[in-house]
Amino acid sequence: MALGGAFSIFMTLCLSCLLILIAWKRTSRGGKLPPGPTPIPFLGNLLQVRIDATFQSFLKLQKKYGSVFTVYFGPRPVVILCGHEAVKEALVDQADDFSGRGEMPTLEKNFQGYGLALSNGERWKILRRFSLTVLRNFGMGKRSIEERIQEEAGYLLEELHKVKGAPIDPTFYLSRTVSNVICSVVFGKRFDYEDQRFRSLMKMINESFVEMSMPWAQLYDMYWGVIQYFPGRHNRLYNLIEELKDFIASRVKINEASFDPSNPRDFIDCFLIKMYQDKSDPHSEFNLKNLVLTTLNLFFAGTETVSSTLRYGFLLLMKYPEVEAKIHEEINQVIGTHRTPRVDDRAKMPYTDAVIHEIQRLTDIVPLGVPHNVIRDTHFRGYFLPKGTDVYPLIGSVLKDPKYFRYPEAFYPQHFLDEQGRFKKNDAFVAFSSGKRICVGEALARMELFLYFTSILQRFSLRSLVPPADIDIAHKISGFGNIPPTYELCFMAR
């Protein structure tokens, strides 16, 4: 290792020790930050926070320190929020204070504060407002998002019929169909399922989500100041994201070659219009970096989260076949066997709606939540959080809050049904987060989940290769995300 690199590591270690001692001394003396386990210089709370079970470690600490506590990721204090009340008070009641995006070191080199998901301040406000407007306009345009989902579901059904009931791994069937919906919005086109470039992209997105959820990623988030100087899997994730960025950039060039500002075809065209309007403003947030990275945010999130939820959902329905049977019955009564399912059917299908909500609640795709940051000195529940403090609102702890869900660890669709069998909202259902940073794609994802589940179950029954009692629904990996187990099933034509 070069002398300069070794010196940098030495200085980082020294600075880490100094910072953690200062922060802990200030906390213990002034009682400003919430309580928490005593950190060790440089290591922080590594002894209390297992990198292979971060979420479970936080729940264990909650029992000792309450619903608001502080842990140290190396030298960096991070405030953890557990349960519905604490998360709501922060993200909704004090929404502006907690509206910043916290550090995500595993992605920092790729994004550098650009793009919708990881930006802050005016940049974030401008990109969020623009993205919401474009998604809303496409939902009401000549070809609605609902029609795009219905069309794509039709292509998927054709592929499943071709298999003729043979066992398949649903992973890439689902990621390709779901991704094509967001592709039609951001790129203005869908990709053939056999397109090798498209298949490669789906593999990269899946691998990226897995890498972000591995124990090494949790370790990197704690000690990135040192680990970044060494070879390791963090470079693998960096390279995957860079390849995805290159693909987005190539799509931007394709759009530019045939760009007509009077006839925007997709999200990229709408962004290009703003870029040309602001081309004389060197400080405009409508620039190529924000275009590529915001498009990547939408492309990535619009592919992985919904497809993972569908994969978990099919597994749960095979484990609980009586639930699948009730959905089949409701589909027969409301939609029938021939008509294409529509979004407005959801209001007449409370049981199916409740099952989808329960799948999202129990599987909890992003249990840690995406980190927030307080944008000013903030008083919260009698504590003082200095400006710039990172905050983790544990979405999983809200979705499994025993005060709001009778059987938090069980699959129980009745969590979302009243005594008359009508759909019942639950304030603690925050699968899309809440407050000012709530997922911009919530409406799209809700439509996709309903239309895909009903379209598939209208035409097929699910058959497991093992008895229901032997189906293991435990996460394959649990970190930043909960990764579904790998399995095969048979789609049997009804």
Curated annotation (Swiss-Prot):
GO terms for biological process: epoxygenase P450 pathway; sensory perception of smell; xenobiotic metabolic process. SUPFAM superfamilies: Cytochrome P450. It is a peripheral membrane protein. Its EC number is 1.14.14.1. GO terms for cellular component: cytoplasm; endoplasmic reticulum membrane; intracellular membrane-bounded organelle. Keywords: Endoplasmic reticulum, Heme, Iron, Membrane, Metal-binding, Microsome, Monooxygenase, Olfaction, Oxidoreductase, Sensory transduction. It is an enzyme of class 1 (oxidoreductase). PROSITE patterns: CYTOCHROME_P450. Pfam families: p450 (PF00067). One of its GO terms (molecular function) is oxidoreductase activity, acting on paired donors, with incorporation or reduction of molecular oxygen, reduced flavin or flavoprotein as one donor, and incorporation of one atom of oxygen. Olfactory epithelium. It catalyses: an organic molecule + reduced [NADPH--hemoprotein reductase] + O2 = an alcohol + oxidized [NADPH--hemoprotein reductase] + H2O + H(+). The keyword Repeat does not apply. Heme binds at C439. It is found in: Endoplasmic reticulum membrane; Microsome membrane. Its main location: endoplasmic reticulum. Belongs to the cytochrome P450 family. Cytochromes P450 are a group of heme-thiolate monooxygenases. This isozyme seems to be implicated in olfaction. This is Cytochrome P450 2G1.
